[in-house]
């Protein structure tokens, strides 16, 4: 069994405010390519474990859910850092969160209490590190966002254990965007 923590930028950090933004398709394609490469190595159970943030985490789950028909060994888990996560979000985002919660194979709160302190977020990070074998980050250290905290704790954890990290930076995203645009042009020509 393999377990990967998928995380990265929030949608607003990438200036993405609509689900149909072409950047979402590019990011999901990057995520699918990574997952396919991992899944094609063997038929062992493979878990995508992530959090509830709008952005990379949700897109990671959506990408995994789209691949499940072709890869029955692929499982999805959504972990909230604390109870009632997202209750302050607008209704549309709450509906999206509820929807993805109902589609995953496993869902739980790391802390059963509503938000009380930053310690719950640190506990969440520790939980994710100790319950996964590697991390996939959509993150560029030159353009820090909230993912900086996950990146730093993963770097530190890697020094103490056999934990690996794959991260996709903006240069790699740009390459994929150009390839995606070319594929779209080819489709339009036919």
Curated annotation (Swiss-Prot):
- Family annotation (Pfam families): YpsA
Q: Which SUPFAM superfamilies match?
A: MCP/YpsA-like
Q: Which domain of life is it from?
A: Bacteria
Give the matching PANTHER family: UPF0398 PROTEIN SPR0331, UPF0398 PROTEIN YPSA
Task: Report the family membership.
Answer: Belongs to the UPF0398 family.
For this entry, the protein name equals UPF0398 protein Lreu_0922
